[in-house]
Amino acid sequence: MSKDEKKSRSKKRGTVSMPLVNPNAAGIDIGDSLHAVAVPPDRGEVCVREFGAFTEDLEKIATWLKQCKVDTVAMESTGIYWRNLFAVLVQHGFEVYLVNAKHTRNITGKKDDESDAQWIQKLHSCGLLKSCFLPDDKIETLRTLVRHRRSLTQDSSRYVLRMQKSMELMNIKIHTVISDMTGKTGTAIVKAIIGGEREPQNFLPLVDSRIKATKEEILKSLKGNWRSEHLFLLKQCYNLYQHMQTQIELCEQQIEKVLQSMTPDEDIASQSTRRKRSKNQPRFNTTDYLRRIHTIDVTQIFGVSEIGALEILSETGTDLSKWGSEKRFVSWLNLCPNNKISGGKLISSQLLKKKPNAASQAFRMAANSQKTSKNWLGDYFRRMRSKGGQKYAIVATARKLAIIYYKMVRYKQSFTPFDIDQYREKYRLAKIKYLEKALKQLQVAA
């Protein structure tokens, strides 16, 4: 055998051929000011080009891809930079895959924009990339507004903490005597302080009769050193808090308009007919909107509040069949173990280290609220806590809630909770069956 034949044979053995699933695929590496675009090598002399990020540049990208006869495009979900290019490509009729950046990592030592774009194009042409979940236009609008409302609520709470800090620096301890500084009594006292009142005795008429603290405790808490700089900070923080509350109300009006566009033309029950509004809940009748959108009441699920159900809707939409199964749904929410198996053995089962989205956080908060409840879910939470700790119990219970939500929304099933005695009996019988099976295995081994 000649040397040339040996070399050609060794080359054939070293190469791995992958079937082309998407022969007309392109890959784009997204950036803030530059986008690198790669097309198949047989589409021209130049298969990788860099474009700017202005609107006219995005149109040039779409035009060039049309000239190269590309019909499907893959791009990384890099920050928010992908959004405008994604919208332009969809308008021009391309099938666009938005891909998790972890799934497109290039070989170490070959990191630059052009090689990344070529690598994405190669993976996409071989059908190795999966598109992220993307909601429709209405859900996208709702998600943007609900996320903005959440940010406003968090900013609002920061100003409350700064108000408390200002009073603490003046040794005004009223925030340790009453439970809520933004309630009726707390707001009245802060407004009086800003208005110039300094005598503790004059604050007593502002105290609501439902406050549990005694008059003596309230009087003691309102004696301090009234420093001008801290009074100025208190006034500014209070005004900013009120401003944030106004902005939250305006944001809720926009959210309600979106919900109205998603529901049939029927009258929504007024605020007076809904259950009592808790703190930080929307000012409109969220439950009725959700009931009409889903045709079932998801707020009946243990621990799921109105704002929690609204956040889940804004993140997942109304069509949960996109996930295929409840297992994929809880995996997307990062509420199941990331099992790593090697040699037939489980070597790791920890959760993926990624920030949970708003829907996952809503399920976790609902699960945490069940730790002292006297229903079957609370019993399950406490059993999981004794097994693996608080965090383990929250994730396990949140997974239960996510599965219940998935079945209710997708299959239009009503929430039918177990009786706690029946649930405990079911668990007892299952444990007996497990122990009997383990005993038989030990007897066989002996």
What are these model-derived regions, one by one?
Residues M1-A446:
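A detector of single, family-specific signature residues
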